[in-house]
Structures are given as structure tokens and as C-alpha cells.
């Protein structure tokens, strides 16, 4: 009864249990030899991560055009949703990784000028596996993406089926590189 009363008092005072939320780390970065630049990412570790030796599954989240490594956190509120669903027993704890995809479509370009998929598969996934307690089997990795990220989720997972056990593409932007080259979408975002 005392715990319930304390929670009600804290909730009414505007403190809604934020101390129990997952650990959000925004603005992390890794240098990519493939892309020849630093790539920012956010990572969300489940509550209790720092006090356990459990290996967690990883969900890689790809944003859409105009987004970045903070979009799923700011607009999707994914850390709170994750925490709530774990506490309600609807899902098991897991790690979320949100890399900055720029305008890459999470793919390598035909001419080799941008090697985003190479970065993701050969650099970021191994880096996360080596620096966090992750499940390294196929059922321990998933990808979800929205729009441009939906395209990336489909294309990356289909070419790397041995690494990812599931994929979700939300409103994927299924277009060819030629269409984007001809339309030059960067001009729209720069104006």
C-alpha cells in the first residue's frame, strides 16, 4: 500500500517514475572506414541492464528521410513504449540501436560512393555485439524501418538473412536509385 501511495504522490507531483526508465544514450558515435566519417547513433538499454549479465536481443531501427538517430526517440517515444511493454509483460527486454542513416537508404550505392550497408553489416553490428551484451544468433537481431528506413530494413535483411531473424517495414519507400538521382531529393531538404 505504501508503494502505491508513493507512486501516486510522485505521479501527481510530475515525477512519473523516470528513474526506472531504460537507459537512453543519444549522440554516441563510431568512426566508419567504409563511409570515411563518424556515424552517430542512439542506444536504449533495458532497465536493469547495468546490474545483470543477461545477453539481450537487439532491434535496429532505421529512420525515414529527414530524420536522424534521435527521430524514433523524439517522435516515436520508443524508450517509454519499450519500458511500458516490458513492465506489462508483453515483450521481453531488448536493446534498441538507432543509427543515423542520412539520405543513404541504408544501402551501398551502385558506384561505391556511399557504402552504408557495408558500414552497417561489417562495422556497426559487430561493434554493438562487441561492446554490449547482445544475443549474437539470428533470432537475437531484428530490423524495423519507416519510409526510407523501411526500404533499408527490407533490403539489408534480405541480403543478410543469416544475421536477422525478423524485419518490419513501415510504409517502405520502394523506389529505385535512378528515380532518386533524377529527382534530386536533397534539393528539397536543403531549401
Regions found by a protein language model. Name each.
Residues 4-14:
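Sec-dependent N-terminal signal peptides
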Residues 19-191:
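Non-catalytic cap/lid and distal C-terminal segments of serine-dependent acyl enzymes
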Amino acid at each position: 500500500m505504501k508503494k502505491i501511495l508513493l507512486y501516486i504522490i510522485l505521479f501527481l507531483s510530475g515525477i512519473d517514475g523516470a528513474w526506472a526508465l531504460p537507459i537512453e544514450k543519444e549522440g554516441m558515435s563510431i568512426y566508419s572506414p567504409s563511409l570515411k566519417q563518424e556515424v552517430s547513433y542512439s542506444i536504449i538499454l533495458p532497465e536493469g541492464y547495468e546490474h545483470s549479465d543477461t545477453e539481450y536481443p537487439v532491434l535496429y531501427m532505421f529512420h525515414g528521410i529527414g530524420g536522424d538517430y534521435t527521430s524514433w526517440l523524439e517522435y516515436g517515444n520508443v524508450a517509454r513504449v519499450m519500458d511500458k511493454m516490458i513492465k506489462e509483460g508483453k515483450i521481453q527486454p531488448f536493446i534498441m540501436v538507432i543509427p543515423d542513416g542520412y539520405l543513404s537508404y541504408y544501402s551501398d550505392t551502385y558506384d561505391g560512393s556511399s557504402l552504408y550497408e557495408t558500414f552497417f553489416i561489417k562495422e556497426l553490428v559487430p561493434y554493438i555485439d562487441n561492446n554490449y551484451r547482445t544475443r549474437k544468433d539470428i533470432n537475437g537481431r531484428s530490423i524495423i524501418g519507416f519510409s526510407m528506413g523501411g526500404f533499408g530494413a527490407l533490403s539489408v535483411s534480405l541480403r543478410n538473412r543469416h544475421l536477422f531473424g525478423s524485419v518490419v517495414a513501415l510504409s517502405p519507400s520502394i523506389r529505385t536509385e535512378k528515380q532518386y538521382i533524377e529527382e534530386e531529393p536533397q534539393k528539397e531538404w536543403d531549401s
